[in-house]
């Protein structure tokens, strides 16, 4: 009589390695399964940040303009991505700096073999994940707290970038406690989050009207806004769940 077959036990999913990394104003949290993948991200950040600094030394206007900017065709990759994203949204290229650095870092991790890689650059996040990931949205003093978004497993890079007029040091001309954009173009997500945040006033109607700035932009999957006691969503937004979101968890870039 044959022995009954037994299914092999599933190996437990190990917790990812997390590391905080700071290079001058760039402060990131990196998550991966392999220390080598984290090192790949750190090296990419060093290289692309140095390239960006060199470009800004040659043209300081790039850093300070809040308007669309034209760059030469032979400009560095980091510059071209930022310019394209900012111009798409009708704002300056620095609106996309954090998301662009995050994306370039995750791309380097993927080249190093990563199937699970997350870089959080001050709330501007690039990720690729072979298992579900919950990303928390921090909305400052809003009563809408402990909000998480479930990113299902995927084999390509995507992004979620957040801007706020009431939280953090970044420039915003609006009153959003959180304005988040979902896009596979992480540079675009960053610039669009800035543009969306700029549009948010106070109250329910102000939240509803703000989405007009992103509704017609190709490449944007969805958007979410929290303003005080109000929350609004447009397009395709990841499934919402409860998540423990504390201020000290936020990468302060």
Swiss-Prot record:
Protein species of origin: Methanosarcina acetivorans (strain ATCC 35395 / DSM 2834 / JCM 12185 / C2A)
Name of this protein: UPF0280 protein MA_1715
SUPFAM superfamilies (alphabetical): ApbE-like
Residues passing through the membrane, by range: none
HAMAP family per UniProt: UPF0280
Lineage top rank: taxon: Archaea
Similarity section: Belongs to the UPF0280 family.
NCBIfam families assigned to the protein according to its UniProt record, in alphabetical order: PRK04334.1-4
């Amino acid at each position: 009589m044959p022995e009954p077959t037994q299914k092999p036990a599933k190996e437990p999913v190990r917790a990812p390695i997390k590391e905080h990394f700071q290079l001058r104003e760039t402060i990131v949290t990196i998550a991966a399964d392999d220390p080598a993948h984290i090192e790949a991200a750190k090296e990419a950040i060093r290289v692309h940040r140095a390239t960006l600094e060199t470009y800004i030394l040659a043209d300081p206007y790039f850093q300070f303009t809040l308007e669309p900017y034209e760059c030469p065709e032979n400009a560095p990759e980091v510059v071209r991505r930022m310019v394209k994203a900012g111009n798409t949204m009708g704002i300056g290229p620095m609106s996309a700096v954090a998301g662009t650095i995050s994306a370039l870092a995750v791309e380097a991790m993927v080249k190093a073999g990563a199937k699970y890689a997350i870089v959080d650059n001050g709330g501007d996040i690039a990720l690729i994940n072979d298992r579900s990931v919950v990303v928390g949205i921090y909305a400052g003093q809003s009563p809408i707290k402990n909000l998480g978004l479930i990113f299902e497993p995927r084999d390509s890079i995507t992004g979620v970038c957040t801007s706020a007029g009431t939280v953090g040091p970044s420039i915003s001309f609006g009153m959003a406690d959180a304005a988040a954009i979902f896009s596979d173009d992480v540079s675009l997500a960053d610039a669009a989050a800035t543009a969306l945040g700029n549009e948010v006033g106070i109250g329910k109607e102000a939240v509803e009207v703000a989405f007009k700035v992103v509704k017609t932009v190709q490449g944007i999957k969805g958007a979410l806004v929290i303003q005080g006691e109000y929350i609004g969503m447009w397009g395709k937004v990841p499934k919402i769940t409860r998540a423990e979101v504390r201020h000290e968890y936020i990468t302060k870039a």
